[in-house]
Structures are given as structure tokens and as C-alpha cells.
Design a protein with these regions (language model features):
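ATPase catalytic-site recognition across NTP-hydrolyzing enzymes
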Residues: 1-55, 69, 170-171
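Residues embedded in well-ordered secondary-structure elements
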Residues: 43-44, 56, 94, 142
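Short, flexible loop/turn motifs enriched in small residues
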Residues: 48, 59-66
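Generic detector of well-ordered alpha-helical packing
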Residues: 54-57, 109
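A general structural motif
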Residues: 57-60, 86-87
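Mg2+-dependent endonuclease catalytic cores in nucleic-acid-processing enzymes, primarily RNase H-like
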Residues: 73-173
Length: 173
């Protein structure tokens, strides 16, 4: 009956029927198996798909600036830098833009991101800022842009290809 109601691969069936541990906790937004599956999935390697770069700038402390390069469903590169000033961070982003030639570079404009975005805009790079406090496109479903983007990423992970990267996995789950 549990399998009929919830499905053979559901956490309910894993616990109640098979006596296994659930794949995810009740409060966990992204299940570990989604990330593990994406890390095992081969790259699609669609060289005609546009490249998009995402940047989460940071300065000082334990946080790192992270630059992620995506082509279609594939994450093709993750670069991390710790402790750099704003202009050095801009330099790292320019290096990634020059190497990967993205259709767009999206930057978290909270905190340090405003200065990074302003400098890259001044230098005529095609960049767009995103503020995670913005209103979601579907405010009934999502409380803000951050929640909406996490939801979109969770859906995307079902077909994505991620590199084997323990820091990425820890950030996602």
C-alpha cells in the first residue's frame, strides 16, 4: 500500500517497506541523491549552447569568491578565490570572461557585488546583477528571489552534470 501511494523509490517506502534510511531529511531542500546523481552524470557537451558565468563575490574571512561556468546543463568550471580585494576579484572575473566568452555573466550584487558589478559595467562587459532579496517572479510560490533560484536549481539538478567537488556538494545540501 505504501509503494502504491508514495512510489517504490520514495523515502516513505525506503523506511517503512525496505527498512532503509531516507534519501533526504524532512527539512532538507536539496536531497543528497540529486547532487550525487548530477556528479555521476556525464557532461552533455553541447558546444553550441551559450555559456553563462555566475559569480558570488566575497572578501575576507572564511568566505570565498566563487566563479561558476555553465554551458547548457553542464557545470564546466568552478573557480574559488579567498581574501582578494574588489579589483583583484574583478580581475579574476575578467579572466573567466575572456577564457569562456559567456553570453552573460550574472553577479550576486549583495555586499561586495555592487562594486564588482559597477566596475565590470564600466569596462563594458555584459553583466547583470541579481539581488537575492528581490521579489520572486512567483511570490505565491517563493518568498523572495533567493528561494526562487534555489527551487529552480533543485529542478535543474535532475538533469544537470556537476563536477566531483566536495565543497560544492556541501554548499548544495
Amino acid at each position: 500500500q505504501i509503494i502504491d501511494e508514495y512510489g517504490e523509490d520514495s523515502d516513505e517506502a525506503r523506511v517503512e517497506v525496505y527498512g532503509d534510511f531516507p534519501k533526504s531529511g524532512q527539512d532538507q531542500f536539496i536531497a543528497p541523491h540529486l547532487v550525487d546523481d548530477a556528479m555521476r552524470r556525464p557532461q552533455h557537451k553541447d558546444m553550441t549552447a551559450p555559456v553563462v558565468i555566475g559569480v558570488d563575490p566575497a572578501r575576507g574571512g572564511a568566505d570565498s569568491t566563487v566563479i561558476v561556468v555553465r554551458r547548457a546543463r553542464d557545470i564546466v568550471a568552478i573557480k574559488r578565490y579567498r581574501g582578494d580585494d574588489t579589483m583583484t576579484t574583478v580581475g579574476h572575473i575578467i579572466d573567466a570572461i575572456e577564457e569562456y566568452r559567456p553570453a552573460l555573466t550574472v553577479i550576486d550584487e549583495g555586499g561586495l557585488g555592487y562594486g564588482v558589478l559597477d566596475r565590470l559595467t564600466e569596462q563594458k562587459y555584459k553583466v547583470r546583477g541579481v539581488n537575492f532579496g528581490w521579489k520572486a517572479k512567483n511570490p505565491v510560490m517563493w518568498g523572495n528571489k533567493r528561494a526562487e533560484m534555489w527551487g529552480a536549481m533543485r529542478d535543474w539538478l535532475r538533469s544537470a552534470s556537476l563536477p566531483q567537488d566536495r565543497l560544492l556538494k556541501a554548499d548544495l545540501i
